[in-house]
Swiss-Prot record:
Protein species of origin: Pongo abelii
Similarity section: Belongs to the adenylate kinase family. AK3 subfamily.
The protein's name in its UniProt record: Adenylate kinase 4, mitochondrial
Source superkingdom: Eukaryota
Any one GO biological process: regulation of oxidative phosphorylation
Gene: AK4
UniProt-annotated binding residues for AMP: 36, 41, 62-64, 89-92, 96, 170
The keyword ATP-binding belongs to this UniProt entry's keyword annotation: yes
SUPFAM superfamilies listed in its UniProt record: Microbial and mitochondrial ADK, insert 'zinc finger' domain (SSF57774), P-loop containing nucleoside triphosphate hydrolases (SSF52540)
Residues covered by region (NMP): 35-64
Places the protein is found: Mitochondrion matrix
Pfam families: ADK, ADK_lid
């Protein structure tokens, strides 16, 4: 199997299970899971220049613009030139995808297609610990104590945009922005779309796909 570094991207709407799939890919194949949300939180906490720029938009519940998120992610990717990685939350727009093109070639793109009703149900059951970004789902990943973060003991909250009335708008926005990104990667022959309502049913196919590109470090049973 080739020793070429693997550059992968995962796409999917809020509630599609991207975080869970990324975690399994990282565990099974040794890829670095690079989450734009995680890097944003780190930079905001550290009061970096790019963190301060992003904070202005996040506090107003606005999407962080391309030039800010691209600057942040380019810096992170520059530090990981010698690693296999999986991008989560970037690129979200065609502009971001074009910026990524300038520094590397993406080998593999996964797009998760989850029915709207499933997304609505999942998001309405989702609670988060804002300081860390830890996400819980009351159905399949509940906290040990209801409403409390497992690690810190701090209270969990439900985001306003996870409430059912906001989910439809978020999904429409995702589809509008993601469509040209999906079409771009589809035209290059690197896009693989997975549809379903359960991560556990999608996972074996994702595992097989990655196994054809990179040697697993542990068996697929290791969830």
């Amino acid at each position: 199997m080739a020793s070429k570094l693997l550059r992968a991207v995962i796409l999917g709407p809020p509630g599609s299970g991207k975080g869970t799939v990324c975690q399994r890919i990282a565990q099974n194949f040794g890829l670095q899971h690079l989450s734009s949300g995680h890097f944003l939180r780190e930079n905001i906490k550290a009061n970096t220049e790019v963190g301060e720029m992003a904070k202005q938009y996040i506090e107003k519940s606005l999407l962080v613009p391309d030039h800010v998120i691209t600057r942040l992610m380019m810096s992170e990717l520059e530090n990981r030139r010698g690693q296999h990685w999986l991008l989560d939350g970037f690129p979200r727009t065609l502009g971001q995808a074009e910026a990524l093109d300038k520094i590397c070639e993406v080998d593999l793109v996964i797009s998760l297609n989850i029915p709207f009703e499933t997304l609505k149900d999942r998001l309405s059951r989702r609670w988060i610990h804002p300081p860390s970004g830890r996400v819980y789902n009351l159905d399949f990943n509940p906290p040990h104590v209801h409403g409390i973060d497992d690690v810190t003991g701090e209270p969990l909250v439900q985001q306003e945009d996870d409430k059912p009335e906001a989910v439809a708008a978020r999904l429409r926005q995702y589809k509008d922005v993601a469509k040209p990104v999906i079409e771009l990667y589809k035209s290059r022959g690197v896009l693989h779309q997975f549809s379903g309502t359960e991560t556990n049913k999608i996972w074996p196919y994702v595992y097989t796909l990655f196994s054809n590109k990179i040697t697993p470090i542990q068996s697929k049973e290791a969830y």
